[in-house]
Amino acid sequence: MENVYYIIIITAIIFEFLLSSLSSLLDIKNITSKIPESFKKAYNQEKYVKSQQYLEARTRFGLFSNLFSISLILFVIHSELFGILDNYVRNQTESYIFQGLLFIGIIYFIQDIISLPFSIYNSFIIEEKFGFNKSTIKLFFIDKIKGYLIFI
């Protein structure tokens, strides 16, 4: 019976990824530099083209980061790392509440560290390229540390 749940979970994860990726690819396919008639009075051509370039860059990056994420999720599920983490957490405390908090906290921290290069690229490459980034590396990491402190 466990195998059935495993297959259902893996199928749902892959299906959601494929559906999301298809949606993103359709978005990219429909990007055009020609401003729609309904926007001509509200937008100038240059700003519209820049917004479409930004949309494409963000969408392509999202496709790549989602592919990385699903690969990692499938690896973790298949390798039974959740079970290993669960055993570790259960040996740290007998309190079910603290076990749950520790389990979620460790997963959050690991996920945040793994996604750090993607966040840096998004903020300091993509956002910078289009003039949206007003942050510095120092401020970026100070915000990360503040986020960890709030989480604790």
What are these regions (language model features)?
Residues 1-152:
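Hydrophobic or amphipathic, alpha-helical segments that drive membrane association/targeting
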